[in-house]
Curated annotation (Swiss-Prot):
The keyword tRNA processing is annotated on this UniProt entry: no
GO cellular component, as recorded: cytoplasm
Pathway terms, separated by semicolons: Amino-acid biosynthesis; L-histidine biosynthesis; L-histidine from 5-phospho-alpha-D-ribose 1-diphosphate: step 4/9
Originating gene: hisA
Source organism of this protein record: Variovorax paradoxus (strain S110)
Family named by the database record: Belongs to the HisA/HisF family.
Protein's name according to its UniProt entry: 1-(5-phosphoribosyl)-5-[(5-phosphoribosylamino)methylideneamino] imidazole-4-carboxamide isomerase
Length: 247
């Protein structure tokens, strides 16, 4: 089970939002590269970056901070990034910078042709982020609910050749209310590509539950507010996941 620390970037700082609200942000570090180093030293084997300004602006806004993180962690730690990725040139630039995976969210839902082109041009590097509330997909920084069912879109994108799906329950993100295990497993069972859980991770019990469903296709989990608030010790959680996996 991959435990993937999230580094959310706003105005060059590492922050956490409450339920995706840019006006409800807490700064956890003014040096995101140092934060990246901290998580790698604690045992992280992948990092999850979000360009929050980019997600709302529709184009990259924290490029300098992202490049600094990539320089800090080097080639050994895969880094995935979402937020403001709406064209092939942006993907190419990030991959040239050393990014392993780009996460396409809103653009995948609104412009599936772009996603298909991205999978052809950058096979193996494309992850789709599906954000949902009550099984319905949301777009535009969670501000718009669509009528699309998560599983239907997941299957469609799997056919395009995406690497994996990050599933976020936006009713729980940043609320420390526990992962929506049932919804995550339901999506994983509908697909053959891996699903990464996101939204609501709060304690070691969540880690135990996730490890129990890893065989269903749940590859990992994004670790956000809980590891910043101290509710979850990241190093202990990764050690627990490895122990349960017999690693």
């Amino acid at each position: 089970m991959l435990l993937i620390p999230a580094i959310d970037l706003k105005d060059g700082h590492c922050v956490r939002l409450k339920q995706g609200d840019m006006d409800q942000s807490t700064i956890f570090s003014e040096d995101p590269a140092a934060m990246a180093r901290k998580w790698v030293e604690a045992g992280a084997r992948r990092l999850h970056l979000v360009d929050l300004n980019g997600a709302f602006a529709g184009k990259p806004q924290n490029h300098a901070a992202i490049k600094a993180i990539l320089r800090e962690v080097g080639d050994d730690i895969p880094v995935q990034l979402g937020g403001g990725i709406r064209d092939l040139d942006t993907i190419e630039r990030y991959i040239d910078d050393g990014l392993r995976y780009v996460i396409i969210g809103t653009a995948a839902v609104k412009n599936p042709g772009f996603l298909k082109d991205a999978c052809v041009a950058f096979g193996g590097h494309i992850i789709v982020g599906l954000d949902a509330k009550d099984g319905k997909v949301a777009t535009d920084g969670w501000s718009k609910l669509t009528g699309h069912e998560v599983a239907d879109l997941g299957k469609k994108f799997e056919d395009y050749g995406v690497e994996s799906i990050i599933y976020t329950d936006i009713g729980r993100d940043g609320m420390l209310s526990g992962i929506n295990i049932d919804a995550t497993v339901k999506l994983a069972q509908a697909l053959t590509i891996p699903v990464i859980a996101s939204g609501g991770l709060s304690n070691m019990a969540d880690i135990d539950q996730l490890c129990a469903v890893e065989s269903e296709g749940v590859e990992g989990v994004i670790c956000g507010r809980a590891i910043y608030s101290g509710d979850l010790d990241f190093a202990a959680a990764q050690a627990r996941a490895d122990e349960l996996a017999g690693a």
